[in-house]
């Protein structure tokens, strides 16, 4: 077993906003499908995490613009190695679209584990709930909700004591996994079972990819918020209202209430959708949604991120009702108007709290002296028991090499963090002296098993080489550059400088006194169309 040690230094661009304004996104670097709740003056957001572990990242804020990662809903292997599987889950599977809510002293997260066994059998969409008294954890084991099809579930606590599960199903069949229509059913949260009848309540406005439902009760009405149009550039947020939670729901005639589908790639963000709403203590309202930056011809290596917009409620005519033989009167419901002055997500928006400015500090320096790995580090799937150590060589993260190559459904010695900006510097000090040939260690810009860029040190016949390899979808791995490391003594510093659309790579063999330029690469080679890019140690 080959062992190697690393120290990380990462400097991302620190961003300062205009006085009195905050900058979107509020949570950068692959934090899609945000759901938000408030307890007093504390706000909490949870996001999708797909096949990555720990899963379900939870952020905390006092002001809606400065967010701190405080923990994960899925943070133990025993939560993820049964019916809820993050051990050998396929790429793009795993945890989809959670909802976080607080009720009578307990936090609830409800979400879906999408799992495909790979043997040709139908894929599974297992909806489950976890609970905690403290949002930073520990969180409970997953409670699987049997017989609940679809993805993106919501849990709603009505003021009459009933609790409702809201989910999706394929059009025309309320027992079929998929998206397109929204269903509601009462749930017993003591037994974790659905009870009563199931009701299909809405298929959205245009009937395309209706998903991501959330239920609210305001102004004497039940509101059903959904995402529609797919998670690409036609993404949008729609809303409907009803006097009964089971419907019928009246569509807001001003839908969509949020979208960027009408904006060009010259705007800073696209694909906004999959939203949640929150009321502040003073009665004001805000919305969070996902969005994707337009850094690379409509895409970005940060994937889908979390954005914040103000909103307000305004009366809207939903239909005309006949009140007498010759008289009709309008029926008006209050509906949200998002970003009331512009109707779109803004890069700069007035602060929710004028006395609480935003400061984004993206600098990370990890000397690995703590007993536990920093919360920002992420694995692809649940790591095997002997993947890393912080105690074997204090002050270093020791990774243990594993046989084979990076491939779908496998677990490998790779740990990284979410790329948060297009402009950054990433530096890793590596101690690597393998006994065997063709063992490699270095850094990876990892998008998926089928799309990544490696810069690694490799030993071949007592000589050490630095080489760059690119894996693109549907293509074989290609070596782009290879150079012999003259004078290599087992220690090297690898550095990446990123500037929007290009990565420049450097290395140092003299403890950082000077760096040698290695090569460059267009960032679009590992562009994250939907999920994330992980600058990683490998």
Regions found by a protein language model. Give the residues of each.
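Hydrophobic core segments of beta-strands in well-ordered, beta-rich domains
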Residues: 37-52, 59, 96-119, 141-145, ...
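Short, aromatic/His-centered strand-loop micro-motif at the edge of beta-sheets
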Residues: 472-493
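Blade-edge beta-strand/turn elements of extracellular beta-propeller
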Residues: 19-26, 67-76, 81-88, 130-148, ...
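Short carbohydrate-recognition loop motifs
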Residues: 391-407, 467
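Single conserved hydrophobic/aromatic residue that forms the stacking wall/gate
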Residues: 531-538
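Beta-propeller fold recognition
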Residues: 24-29, 296-392, 398, 420
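Secretory/extracellular carbohydrate-interaction modules
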Residues: 406-462
């Amino acid at each position: 077993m080959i062992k190697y040690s690393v120290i990380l230094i990462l400097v991302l661009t620190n961003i300062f906003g205009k006085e009195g304004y905050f900058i979107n996104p509020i949570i950068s670097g692959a934090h899609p499908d945000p759901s938000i709740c408030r307890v007093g003056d504390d706000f909490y957001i949870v996001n999708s995490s797909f096949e990555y572990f720990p899963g379900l990242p939870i952020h905390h804020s006092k002001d809606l613009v400065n967010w701190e990662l405080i923990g994960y809903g899925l943070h133990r292997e025993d939560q993820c190695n049964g019916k809820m599987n993050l051990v050998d889950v396929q790429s793009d599977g795993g945890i989809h679209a959670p909802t976080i809510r607080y009720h009578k002293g307990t936090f609830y997260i409800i979400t879906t584990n999408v799992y495909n066994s790979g043997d040709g059998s139908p894929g599974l969409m297992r909806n489950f709930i976890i609970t905690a008294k403290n949002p930073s954890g520990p969180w409970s084991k997953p409670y699987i909700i049997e017989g609940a099809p679809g993805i993106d579930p919501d849990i709603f606590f009505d003021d009459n004591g009933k609790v409702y599960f809201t989910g999706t199903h394929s059009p025309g069949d309320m027992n079929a996994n998929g998206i397109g229509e929204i269903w509601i059913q009462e749930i017993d949260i003591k037994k974790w079972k659905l009870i009563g009848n199931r009701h299909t309540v809405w298929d959205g406005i245009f009937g395309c990819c209706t998903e991501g439902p959330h239920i609210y009760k305001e102004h004497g009405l039940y509101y059903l918020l959904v995402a529609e149009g797919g998670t690409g550039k036609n993404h949008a947020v729609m809303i409907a209202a009803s006097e009964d939670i089971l419907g019928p729901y009246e569509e807001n005639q001003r839908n969509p209430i949020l979208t960027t589908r009408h904006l060009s790639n010259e705007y800073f963000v696209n694909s906004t959708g999959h939203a949640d709403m929150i009321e502040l203590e003073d009665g004001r309202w805000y919305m969070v949604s996902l969005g994707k930056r337009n850094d690379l011809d409509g895409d970005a290596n940060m994937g889908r991120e979390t954005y914040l917009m103000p909103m307000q409620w305004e009366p809207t005519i939903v239909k005309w009702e006949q009140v007498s033989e010759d008289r009709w009167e309008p029926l008006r419901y209050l509906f949200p108007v998002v970003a009331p002055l512009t109707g779109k997500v803004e890069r700069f928006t007035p602060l929710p709290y004028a006395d609480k400015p935003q400061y984004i500090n993206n600098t990370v320096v990890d000397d690995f002296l703590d007993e536990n790995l920093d919360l920002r580090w992420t694995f692809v799937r649940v790591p095997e028991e002997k993947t890393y150590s912080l105690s074997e060589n204090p002050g270093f993260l020791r990774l243990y090499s594993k046989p084979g190559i990076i491939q779908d459904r496998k677990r490998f010695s790779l740990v990284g963090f979410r790329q948060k900006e297009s402009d950054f510097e990433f530096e890793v000090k590596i101690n690597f002296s393998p006994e065997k040939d063709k063992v490699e260690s270095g850094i990876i810009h990892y998008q998926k098993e089928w799309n990544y860029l490696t810069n690694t040190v490799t030993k071949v016949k007592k000589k050490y080489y630095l080489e760059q390899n690119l894996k693109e979808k549907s293509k074989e791995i290609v070596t782009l550059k290879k150079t012999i490391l003259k004078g290599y003594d087992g220690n090297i510093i690898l550095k990446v400088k990123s500037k929007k659309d290009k990565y420049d790579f450097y290395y140092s063999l003299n403890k950082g006194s000077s760096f040698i330029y290695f090569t460059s690469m267009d960032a679009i080679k590992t562009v994250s169309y939907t999920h994330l890019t992980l600058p990683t140690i490998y």
